[in-house]
Amino acid sequence: MDSEDRPIGFFDSGVGGISVLKEAVKILSNENFVYFGDSKMAPYGVRTVEEVKKLTFNAVEFLLKKNIKALVVACNTATSAAIIDLRKAYSKYMPIVGIEPALKPAVECNRKGNIIIMATPMTLAESKFNNLMKRYSNSNILPLPCSGLVELIEEGKTEGEEIERYLEEKLIPLKGNGIAAVVLGCTHYPFIKKSISKVLNQDVLILDGSKGTVRQLKRQLIKYHIESNKSKIGKIKIFNSMNSQYIIKLSYKLLKE
């Protein structure tokens, strides 16, 4: 089969999807990638479903002009709000992969205590998430809306006093009943794993959906016969609606961390 060198498109409301792109670069190192972050309109988690759908379709149109062969919606909020409509519109042209919280592995670990799901308010309010919760109704799961957290990470604040103070206010009150695992339901949040561990000061499992998403992407590339056969390392291009050097530099910095 001829090598398929067209890039894989990644999209997020900002720099968060870089956490998923990092995993893809590890597993699919010979693929080319193009990433679009919509930091100008971030955060998506406080917008209406219709607003998020419109912004998501605008982002996909941008990526289609880059001649992508597959699409990864590396944003939990956009996946919740728009993945069904995206697949209706584009799945006959290319595979479309979304992301969801890594609730299944958290439940399967069978640890004592509550499973905390940190996510944006919209992700937690959407029917897609509620259906996911119903599948694990026998487990002790506590949704934790985290308004304002995406904004801190977009500013590059992944460690230090400000982010730790925010996390303390959210997480410390939940420690009393025991925490079995923390599930990161937003692709921005893996960048603060160290800070979460520091605040909780205990052996808590912290899980995100990046690996599962990339495994699904790999399966889809094989299914559609569009995986790259080249042996050399692929190229990565990052774009952002904010059109500022700061956000592009932050994106590449997060990719390398």
From Swiss-Prot:
SUPFAM superfamilies assigned: Aspartate/glutamate racemase (SSF53681)
Entry's EC annotation: 5.1.1.3
Family assignment from sequence similarity: Belongs to the aspartate/glutamate racemases family.
Pfam families: Asp_Glu_race
Pathway: Cell wall biogenesis; peptidoglycan biosynthesis
Organism in which the protein naturally occurs: Clostridium kluyveri (strain ATCC 8527 / DSM 555 / NBRC 12016 / NCIMB 10680 / K1)
Active site: C75, C186
Record's catalysed reaction(s): L-glutamate = D-glutamate
Domain of life: Bacteria
GO MF: glutamate racemase activity
Positions that bind substrate: D12, S13, Y44, G45, N76, T77, T187, H188
One GO term (biological process): regulation of cell shape
Protein name: Glutamate racemase
Keywords per UniProt: Cell shape, Cell wall biogenesis/degradation, Isomerase, Peptidoglycan synthesis
